[in-house]
């Protein structure tokens, strides 16, 4: 086996891979193994197919049906509308997935002790047998982020935060892979569930924006701001990261020092690096959200600065700003 797979770099002092893998479990439970990560690749391929089918054969035709009473008058209008339908279908596909994922994830952790006492993520770690349903939840989540990376690189229109989104998805995939290998699945599920909540509202808000439902969009955007701050700027750093930094060493290896890089294992430091990078991205997007909120108050237009760099969207934005300026005059 490669040197980097040595348990010395991954597990607490005195614990080997065989100690975990040879543990017997009750029916319906399992211990994670890195070989299981192939399931994320298979589910990723399945979700790419799911996206193609749902977008092209369900959501785009549905958008056509709902807009049939207002046909475009020009060829340019037809092209613009088809482009809008495609983007709405993309948002609808993601919103549907996030909704199902959030509901299922919440159901899986709702009766688990570590949802209410996060120190249960570390007590007796890594000897935490994982319910098969949680394993599938983890694999599907990993597969979904593989599908998102594929979409960003080959399918989606390029957005202003293209690189940030790509980095975010790779960080998430790395966290899923490493946490599965180390059996830090308990804390991983808490992160995934809490992050899915706001993603539902973001994609629903984009659909409302495309359809120009201004009142509903404003309400949805207020919900995005509230849930974003609650889950990604409060719960994530002050509950999850704080527990990883303080509780985990105290309950697993009490002499562990994060900044003593000669001390093993090293994998927790890699996880902390990824968690911190994710938090930085959360702060970056929070800045964008509050910028949108400020512009909305000043100009009366809820606009998503993450939308596509295309001539038409820029023209529409400038028109809206000019109209509001004329009203003020």
Curated annotation (Swiss-Prot):
**Parts of the chain that traverse the membrane:** 41-61, 95-115, 134-154, 162-182, 187-207, 221-241, 270-290
* GO biological process entries: ceramide biosynthetic process
Matches recorded under InterPro entries: Lag1/Lac1-like, TLC-dom
* Known EC number: 2.3.1.297
Question: According to the record, which residues are glycosylated?
Answer: 22
Keywords from the UniProt entry: Glycoprotein, Lipid biosynthesis, Lipid metabolism, Membrane, Sphingolipid metabolism, Transferase, Transmembrane, Transmembrane helix
Q: What class of enzyme is it?
A: transferase
A cellular-component GO term for this protein: membrane
Substrates-to-products reaction catalysed: a very long-chain fatty acyl-CoA + a sphingoid base = an N-(very-long-chain fatty acyl)-sphingoid base + CoA + H(+); a fatty acyl-CoA + sphinganine = an N-acylsphinganine + CoA + H(+); docosanoyl-CoA + sphinganine = N-docosanoylsphinganine + CoA + H(+); sphinganine + tetradecanoyl-CoA = N-(tetradecanoyl)-sphinganine + CoA + H(+)
What pathway or pathways are given for this protein in its record? Lipid metabolism; sphingolipid metabolism
Start and end of every TLC domain?
A: 86-298
Tissue specificity here reads:
Strong expression in the gut, the posterior bulb of the pharynx, the hypoderm, and unidentified cells of the head and the tail.
Under Pfam families, the record lists: TRAM_LAG1_CLN8
**Topology in the lipid bilayer:** Multi-pass membrane protein
- Give yes or no: UniProt keyword Membrane: yes
Phenotype of the disruptant? Animals deficient in HYL-2 show inability to adapt to oxygen deprivation as a result from the loss of ceramide synthase function.
The Gene Ontology terms for molecular function here are:
transferase activity
Subcellular location, record wording: Membrane
Which family is it part of? Answer: Belongs to the sphingosine N-acyltransferase family.
Q: What does this protein do?
A: Catalyzes the acylation of sphingoid bases to form ceramides, which are key players in cell signaling events such as tolerances to heat, oxidation, and ultraviolet stress. C.elegans contain specific sphingoid bases, which are unique or different in structure compared to the sphingoid bases found in other animals. Two examples of these distinctive compounds are: 15-methylhexadecasphinganine and 15-methylhexadecasphing-4-enine. Exhibits substrate preference for long and very long fatty acyl-coA chains (C20-23). Required for adaptation of the nematode to anoxia.
Q: What is this protein called?
A: Ceramide synthase hyl-2
Which lineage do the record's taxonomy fields give for this organism?
Eukaryota, Metazoa, Ecdysozoa, Nematoda, Chromadorea
Query: Could you tell me the gene encoding this protein?
Result: hyl-2
């Amino acid at each position: 086996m490669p040197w980097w797979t040595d348990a010395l770099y991954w597990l607490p002092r005195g614990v080997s891979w065989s100690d975990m893998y040879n543990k017997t479990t009750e029916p319906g439970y399992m211990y994670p193994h890195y070989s299981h990560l192939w399931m994320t690749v298979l589910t990723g391929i399945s979700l790419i197919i799911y996206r193609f089918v749902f977008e092209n054969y369900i959501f785009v035709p549905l958008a056509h049906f709902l807009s049939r009473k207002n046909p475009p008058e020009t060829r340019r209008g037809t092209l613009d509308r088809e482009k809008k339908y495609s983007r709405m279908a993309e948002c609808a596909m993601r919103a549907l997935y996030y909704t199902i994922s959030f509901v299922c994830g919440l159901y899986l952790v709702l009766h688990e002790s570590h949802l209410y006492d996060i120190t249960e993520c570390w007590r007796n770690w890594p000897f935490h047998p994982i319910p098969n349903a949680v394993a599938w939840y983890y694999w599907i989540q990993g597969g979904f982020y593989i599908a998102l990376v594929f979409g960003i690189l080959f399918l989606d229109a390029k957005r202003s935060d293209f690189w940030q989104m790509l980095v975010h998805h790779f960080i998430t995939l790395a966290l899923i892979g490493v946490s599965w290998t180390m059996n830090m699945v308990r804390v991983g599920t808490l992160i995934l569930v809490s992050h899915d909540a706001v993603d539902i509202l973001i994609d629903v808000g984009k659909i409302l924006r495309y359809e120009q439902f201004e009142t509903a969009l404003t309400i949805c955007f207020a919900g995005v701001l509230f849930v974003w701050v609650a889950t990604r700027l409060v719960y994530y750093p002050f509950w999850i990261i704080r527990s990883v930094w303080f509780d985990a060493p105290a309950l697993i290896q009490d002499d562990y020092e994060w900044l003593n890089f000669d001390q093993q294992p090293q994998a927790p430091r890699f996880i902390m690096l990824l968690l911190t990078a994710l938090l930085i991205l959360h702060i970056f997007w929070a800045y964008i959200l509050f910028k949108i909120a400020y512009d909305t108050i000043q100009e009366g237009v809820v606009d998503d600065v993450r939308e596509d760099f295309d001539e038409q969207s820029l023209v529409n934005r400038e028109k809206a700003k000019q109209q509001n300026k004329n009203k003020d005059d």
